Design a protein with these regions (language model features):
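Membrane-inserting effector segments that mediate pore formation, membrane fusion
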Residues: 82, 86-118
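Terminal, membrane-proximal amphipathic helices
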Residues: 1-90, 116-135
Length: 135
């Protein structure tokens, strides 16, 4: 079954701050999901640990995003073009685990770009129910 070409950062309507990294990540091949999901859990744990020194960190958003990435990966596997969908899910998860992406993750609004990437990918794949509120 043919795989669709990946959408550009502009096609997804990503914030300018997220476009360069998204474009780099879209060139990656999907790797080992168990390892990447472990990195996602570790990233959430770093947020939880950092909460002791900064009560304003977006820990709740990190938890929601970490959980939602697992659901996105699972749904991608059942998509009409699973190779394409899983590749985009991979990009969303990789974007999340990179601390210095469009914005420094460990700042008050540091996950806004991560949420924007996740939500844009969900919308592009037609998984509107997986989208997270950007608080």
């Amino acid at each position: 079954m043919p795989t669709s070409p990946p959408p550009s950062a502009r096609d997804l309507g990503l914030p300018r701050s997220a476009r360069d990294l998204y474009t780099r990540l879209i060139g990656e091949k999907v790797g080992a999901w168990p390892a990447l999901l472990a990195e996602c859990r570790a990233h959430v744990q770093r947020f939880e640990a950092a909460l002791a020194t900064n009560e304003f960190l977006p820990v709740a958003e990190a938890r929601r995003l970490g959980d939602a990435l697992v659901r996105l990966r699972d749904r991608a596997r059942g998509h009409r073009d699973p190779v394409f969908a899983e590749h985009l899910a991979w990009v969303a998860a990789r974007y999340f685990v990179i601390r210095d992406d469009g914005a420094q993750d460990f700042e008050v609004v540091g996950l806004d770009d991560d949420l924007a990437v996740f939500n844009a990918i969900c919308a592009h794949l037609g998984f509107h129910d997986l989208r997270l509120d950007e608080t």
